[in-house]
């Protein structure tokens, strides 16, 4: 059963709420998960003057999430498990990075854009299984990111906690049991084990394409 954007935002905004401007984050100034350049793009499309993303309103960020993330990954047409996984991944890794991981999970060419090849197979697939695989590909990306940029290790715990929360959420939505933990940052998985479950060539190609597009929350 599909979920709504508002339902998806309940999860995503737990991780994206508030203003940040960490010099190590290539996204720069960010508020409610919306980076300044995306906000500039949105306001320009409305014929509005530029202003700091700190001033973004709920109506604005909700519309941005709808137009730039929810609609491009077609989340409203999919089972809620996959819809949530795609939406949150689009917000976290960019739409192109999200769709590449969907394409890798469906074993279709990785263009980074929605294609007929996706449409041809997605409704015949086990969408819960695809959602779980996308979560695992996110986790694997963290491994490559830290190898490429050791200074990004400061974000690793937060990334993995978010990935873990998403993995648990989609499993729960799909009727799978999840363990209760005493600590919020306990993980359900071993990062090395997940990383090594994928063919190295696949992970390297996804990362190469991510870097080629040079995206961080904006396409």
Where are the regions a protein language model picked out?
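Cell-wall polysaccharide-cleaving catalytic domain and substrate-binding groove, primarily
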Residues: 1-219
